[in-house]
């Protein structure tokens, strides 16, 4: 039997009240001590945190036969996929009747297959779409690297491939990012993807799509290898509508607004993230009027963990125009790290960089920049044929274990008290992870009798999303814990004699309106012992003796 309202929770610390003889009466509640499990001891899997299957690649170390010395990493709840526009829309829509349904205009099979397979493993998908990728095809038909449909080639430029490099002699087809035909057709693609997947709870995250190399909002490769740089810094404000310091941008502010509107309109109920290389795209997506249209604030998807900071140089370097001018977008992106997912990808080890300094930087940046998720690929030992050095493994494991939220809860010994028929105890929630949770999880308490039946229930008042410590230290290997306490009050009126436990849980309530596919997860795994079959954790006992007298038993 579940009776709501029989527990009460208020912020603050309960005061012990005087009983007979003026001595404090602790009452019937008694705290159960259960220390938090350190990140260096045990990984705690939960949705949207820790190591994820990047580009559907299995987790490390179990994906590498050379690493059998190390235990398998606990299963992830998340995987990512990027699909080329060419794969999604091979047929020119102008050759089809106007009333052609989406599933005939587009080939959704790669996405559908990934969603189905991941759901069978209790996982969700992070999805992105790209229109150009300089790396790393296994083969190039007709010696051409192209990620847009053939019918879109009039809105692109074909650059002859260099005789040396990663793809010698291969023609590179790069979209003209400001072409109205390109923007219109890509906007229609986004709208179709939204119609099909925005209400699908198997899709957890959609990456802002439509611009840059592999959808990462920069054109370094065309600038460096194809002789196609963006405008010079002193010309960029006029040419683009915003300042570009490194000649790695060619998209205009007007085109950015079109892509932002298309992405936001397509996925209002799905978490969006953005690769932060373009400051104007970040400015638009982090604006308050955009946030109001979405289910949550747009997150950040930086590349190159272990080599580059998760914050782009335009937001952090002392030489940056945006930093020197005190542009508000710098503050906005730094603050956003605290309130939205930060999904990272490791980077290939550069020449001249030692692996220890690489993994140390990765760990320090996970903690400092509130990284939520770390990729399963692209770090030096991922595909190594030799066993990973144990010291390096410890650094790698700590980076993955520290990423994201890591909550625990405990009742405070000695905080219990009783006033009349109401027993109270102070409860502390702590986040030991680098980031706070960003999805809709609801903490609460239940009073459970000796048979395991829930007899009383009430949500907690703590806001777990606020439990994150903002620390600018550049070399911290563990996040600074962030805690909040509240008092739980149990009304003993009408409670039958017996032994009870007060249990805490954090329940999954992340759902989309009118969902086409529903995802339900068990309560959050907390970094402590005692989880029962319902996902609850005992934090205190309550004993009501047979000779107890309450108003209900005096009648």
Q: What is the predicted function of each stretch?
A:
Residues 399-555:
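Extracellular/luminal regions of secreted and cell-surface proteins that mediate adhesion/ECM remodeling
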Residues 134-167, 215-240, 291, 297:
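Aromatic- and acidic-residue-enriched segments that line the glycan-binding/catalytic groove
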Residues 158-182, 186-228:
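Active-site groove signature of glycoside hydrolases
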